[in-house]
Amino acid sequence: MLHKEAVTPGTLELLIEGIRFASLEDIAAMKLNAVIGNGTRLKDFVDIAYLSSYLSFDQMIDAYQKKYQTRNPLIIIKALSFFEEINFKEPLHIIIGIYKWKSVEKRINQMIKSPPKTFPPFS
């Protein structure tokens, strides 16, 4: 279920063939919130790493703060840095490319070290 407030006004009203679409900012905010709330889902970490090709970590944090105003943004860094509880046995379906955890982990660490930067797509 989508949070009723969109980071970018009007984006949750975008319908294509009856499917409601959220902006990348809204998706990033929801993914960060998911990692903070339950840091066990591998998919959330992978999605955040893949989003870094389109949004900087600063933009993701800004989107998170706009969508979830009561949350402390410093928790994001802590949650993204804690990999010990991720369920690596969870089935993961990647549409484009091949998933490699070491690449995802490296990207997340790069995002934290260089928040204003966007990164090239995974190869």
Region locations from a protein language model:
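Compositionally biased terminal segments of proteins
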Residues: 1-123
